[in-house]
């Protein structure tokens, strides 16, 4: 959530910046609630002062019968007035909190303005697109040809947007996750974690998926009191590992990674990419999360994005790096880079990683702070996250980019010996 100071003292400037993200802040509503909060805050403080004074006076005059009886009634009434004011104030604070939870983060000043992906800025291209002297097939056709991507069986048991992988393609899927985890832990310094795939709603409020994106989540309601949500990304449990913590300054940065399945209903993308591995209800991803000091977060974003890029470079997959415009930047992010890998069958780039700086937006929600030794004060950390990478989409890109005219799929050299049991081709 945003720093409350911005909504109390820089309201119109904040509203102007939020408009760049396509969010129209209800200035009159927040102003009205804040004015009422100030009035109730002063009223409650005055009633507390009055109640304390009457209570002390009552104690001082407890031996004077007539006066004590009058004071007793005044103390009782002041207590009722104070409690009523506190209830009203807390109720209003809850409304302000709920209102604030629906406000997105403010985009960074260096993010290009725009409403759609057409306004995203190309930062760089990497790798050479292969030229084919034969008619190429997409990953769906290739999977069917090898009988190792089975949509028919998955549809029978689970419906659309699921897939069953078999044989060498299943092995390649596993190999990719192990390769990514080894790279990020052994070369980039991340700590691997195994995390829950079912979380309470509070965890998703903390990272910003709730309340806005509830329809895109899978909810499991066992009883009225026992409710879970399947994680849409490893970002959720990894970021919540620092929930309500005060971290020693010397322990920053914290760099975490995990391989998890991700579950998304894709309600907001109905009708898009209904076939193939691009947009599934269940897919795997290696997630990267960093917890850093505020002054280091933009530098950390560049490093985190480079870590994700290294996966694509070692797999020798052509890609481009895009800086998202304000309207395309996510709800909780101030700045986001997308890494898009080349799909030759479509002659287009597809997102395979999204790397974002969330500033203190998530930290305020989950109360994640660090203690600054020089000042002996607590400050909110900054959080970052990114895919390193989405495994299914990476696999699909390999199938398409590494196909040969004889129908075989070459295995990227970095995977062959260590991760693919010495296999060089999928036949």
UniProtKB/Swiss-Prot annotation:
The keyword Secreted does not apply. Its EC number is 6.1.1.11. It is found in: Cytoplasm. GO terms for cellular component: cytoplasm. It comes from the Bacteria. ATP binds at residues 264-266, 351-354. GO terms for biological process: selenocysteine biosynthetic process; seryl-tRNA aminoacylation. Keywords: Aminoacyl-tRNA synthetase, ATP-binding, Cytoplasm, Ligase, Nucleotide-binding, Protein biosynthesis. One of its GO terms (molecular function) is ATP binding. Gene3D superfamilies: Bira Bifunctional Protein, Domain 2, Serine-tRNA synthetase, tRNA binding domain. InterPro entries: aa-tRNA-synt_IIb, aa-tRNA-synth_II, aa-tRNA-synth_II/BPL/LPL, Ser-tRNA-ligase_type_1, Ser-tRNA-synth_1_N, SerRS_1_N_sf, SerRS_core, tRNA-bd_arm. Belongs to the class-II aminoacyl-tRNA synthetase family. Type-1 seryl-tRNA synthetase subfamily. Homodimer. The tRNA molecule binds across the dimer. Consists of two distinct domains, a catalytic core and a N-terminal extension that is involved in tRNA binding. Catalyzes the attachment of serine to tRNA(Ser). Is also able to aminoacylate tRNA(Sec) with serine, to form the misacylated tRNA L-seryl-tRNA(Sec), which will be further converted into selenocysteinyl-tRNA(Sec). This is Serine--tRNA ligase. It comes from Buchnera aphidicola subsp. Acyrthosiphon pisum (strain APS) (Acyrthosiphon pisum symbiotic bacterium). The gene is serS.
């Amino acid at each position: 959530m945003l720093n409350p100071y911005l909504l109390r003292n820089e309201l119109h400037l904040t509203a102007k910046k939020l408009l760049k993200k396509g969010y129209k802040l209800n200035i009159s509503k927040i102003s009205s609630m804040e004015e009422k909060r100030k009035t109730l805050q002063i009223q409650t403080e005055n009633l507390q002062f009055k109640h304390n004074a009457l209570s002390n006076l009552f104690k001082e005059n407890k031996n004077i019968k007539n006066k004590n009886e009058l004071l007793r009634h005044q103390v009782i009434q002041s207590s009722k007035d104070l409690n009523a004011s506190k209830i009203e104030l807390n109720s209003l604070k809850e409304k302000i909190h709920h209102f604030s939870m629906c406000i997105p983060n403010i985009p960074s000043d260096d993010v290009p303005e725009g409403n759609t992906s057409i306004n995203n800025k190309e930062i760089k291209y990497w790798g050479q697109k292969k030229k084919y002297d034969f008619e190429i097939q997409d990953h769906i056709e290739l999977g069917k040809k090898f009988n190792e991507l089975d949509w028919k069986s998955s549809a029978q048991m689970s419906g659309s947007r699921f897939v069953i992988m078999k044989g060498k393609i299943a092995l390649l899927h596993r190999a990719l996750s192990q390769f990514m985890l080894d790279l990020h832990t052994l070369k980039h310094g991340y700590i691997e974690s195994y995390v829950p795939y079912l979380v309470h709603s509070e965890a998703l409020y903390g990272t910003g998926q709730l309340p806005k994106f509830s329809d895109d989540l899978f909810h499991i309601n066992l009883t009225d009191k026992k409710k879970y949500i399947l994680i849409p990304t490893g970002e959720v449990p990894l970021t919540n590992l620092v929930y309500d913590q005060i971290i020693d300054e010397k322990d920053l940065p914290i760099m975490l990674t995990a391989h998890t399945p991700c579950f998304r209903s894709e309600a907001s993308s109905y009708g898009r990419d209904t076939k193939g591995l691009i947009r599934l209800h269940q897919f795997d991803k290696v997630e990267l999360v960093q917890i850093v000091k505020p002054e280091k977060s933009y530098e950390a974003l560049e490093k985190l994005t480079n870590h994700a890029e290294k996966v694509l470079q070692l797999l020798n997959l052509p890609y481009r790096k895009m800086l998202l415009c304000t309207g395309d930047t996510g709800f909780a992010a101030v700045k986001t880079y997308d890494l898009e890998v080349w799909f030759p069958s479509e002659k287009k780039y597809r997102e395979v990683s999204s790397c974002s700086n969330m500033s203190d937006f998530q930290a305020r929600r989950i109360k994640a702070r660090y203690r600054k030794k020089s000042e002996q004060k607590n400050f909110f950390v900054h959080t970052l996250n990114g895919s390193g990478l989405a495994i299914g989409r990476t696999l699909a890109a390999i199938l398409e980019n590494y196909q040969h005219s004889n129908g075989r799929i070459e295995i990227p050299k970095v995977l062959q010996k260590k991760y693919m049991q010495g296999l060089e081709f999928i036949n």
